Amino acid sequence: MVTEKTLERINELYHKSKAEGLTDAELAEQKQLRADYVKAFRENLRGQLESIKIKNPDGSLIDVKARHDEKMKRLAEEQAEKGN
């Protein structure tokens, strides 16, 4: 989880890198903090996308993930049929 303190440290290291440069330890810390931030961002985005519901023309609701899974299954079946 990325906290406000983590974001402050990321920004602090960024500004220091522009002003005077970073030590090897600080570069490693910056790299790790950025990786953690990107991971948390992606997990959050995925969670938001998976919670979206799509309303079908018939009025029924379906999860985006379920719709995607159905589409991938259908495409795989079509490709398998073409391969035979």
Curated annotation (Swiss-Prot):
Note the superkingdom of the native organism.
Bacteria
Gene Ontology cellular-component annotations: cytoplasm
Q: Does the keyword Cytoplasm apply?
A: yes
Please tell me where this protein is predominantly located. cytoplasm
S-S pairs? none
Q: Which InterPro entries match?
A: DUF896 (IPR009242)
**What keywords would UniProt list here?**
Cytoplasm
**Localization in the cell:** Cytoplasm
Matching entries from Gene3D superfamilies are given as:
Helix hairpin bin
The family assignment reads: Belongs to the UPF0291 family.
Which PANTHER family does the record match to this protein?
A: UPF0291 PROTEIN BC_1827, UPF0291 PROTEIN CBO2609/CLC_2481
Protein name stated in the entry: UPF0291 protein EUBELI_00985
